[in-house]
């Protein structure tokens, strides 16, 4: 009886002495659940008239808790990094809106709104109006969100940039792969919005993504 009591005491003590540690989910080759983490709108000063199938290409990586995605298409290279995060990018889609605006939908493995991260965006003009760095600073907040976002724009082709994190709306007509499940933030107050403009008012950089047609970015 005494032996059993001592054994139970040791087991209980061992259980309380183990420190809880976060674990990192093992990487998958093909993620089935896509979270709509961000929508990026970019205005350019050359003509882009409609969504082109097969125009966008992507590569992604996850190194030292930093999730990175690089997109090329429509004369732009977009490089985005979410720092110190458990999630990684799984997919992206691009669509062309009115007045030479490009909309980019970004999908990750989990939501952003519970843990706030630092975000870095680099946009480079690849085909027209290439040149020196036009803008290198924080992206101002238009809706309060406990994240910082810095942006670098290389070249002079960009007229405006707007980034919305944890959007509450998703394009119902987006033809995502049938074996994927899309989900998104449903709490209006958990969104974040950042924007900068060089020509028009910032509200001219906003698009109704429900009216656009998108094509998924192909992996390189």
UniProtKB/Swiss-Prot annotation:
Keywords: Early protein, Glycoprotein, Host endoplasmic reticulum, Host-virus interaction, Inhibition of host NF-kappa-B by virus, Secreted, Signal, Viral immunoevasion. Residues 1-17 form the signal peptide. The keyword Membrane does not apply. Glycosylated by host. One of its GO terms (cellular component) is host cell endoplasmic reticulum. GO terms for biological process: symbiont-mediated suppression of host NF-kappaB cascade. It is found in: Host endoplasmic reticulum; Secreted. Induction: Expressed in the early phase of the viral replicative cycle. The keyword Signal applies. InterPro entries: Poxvirus_M2. Its main location: host cell. Plays a role in immune evasion. When secreted, inhibits T-cell activation by preventing the binding of host CD80 and CD86 to soluble CTLA4 and CD28. In the infected cell, may inhibits host NF kappa B activation. Belongs to the orthopoxvirus OPG038 family. Homooligomer. Interacts with host CD80 and CD86 when secreted. This is Early protein OPG038. It comes from Variola virus (isolate Human/India/Ind3/1967) (VARV). The lineage of its organism: Viruses, Varidnaviria, Bamfordvirae, Nucleocytoviricota, Pokkesviricetes. The gene is OPG038.
């Amino acid at each position: 009886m005494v032996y059993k009591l001592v054994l139970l005491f040791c087991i209980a003590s061992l259980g309380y002495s183990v420190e809880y540690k976060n674990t990192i989910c093992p990487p998958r080759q093909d993620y089935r659940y896509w979270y709509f983490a961000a929508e990026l709108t970019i205005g350019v000063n050359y003509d882009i008239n409609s969504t082109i199938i097969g125009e966008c290409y992507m590569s992604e990586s996850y190194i030292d808790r930093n999730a990175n995605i690089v997109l090329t298409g429509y004369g732009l290279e977009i490089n985005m990094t979410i720092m110190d995060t458990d999630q990684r990018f799984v997919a992206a889609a691009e669509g062309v809106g009115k007045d030479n605006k490009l909309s980019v939908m970004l999908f990750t493995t989990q939501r952003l709104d519970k843990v706030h991260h630092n975000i870095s965006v680099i946009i480079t003009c690849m085909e027209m109006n290439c040149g020196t760095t036009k803008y290198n600073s924080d992206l101002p907040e238009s809706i309060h969100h406990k994240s910082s976002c810095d942006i670098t724009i290389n070249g002079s082709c960009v007229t405006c940039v707007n980034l919305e994190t944890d959007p509450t709306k998703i394009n119902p007509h987006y033809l995502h792969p049938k074996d994927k499940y899309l989900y998104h933030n449903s709490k209006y107050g958990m969104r974040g919005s950042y924007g900068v403009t060089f020509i028009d008012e910032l509200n001219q950089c906003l698009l109704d993504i429900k009216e656009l047609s998108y094509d998924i970015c192909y992996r390189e």
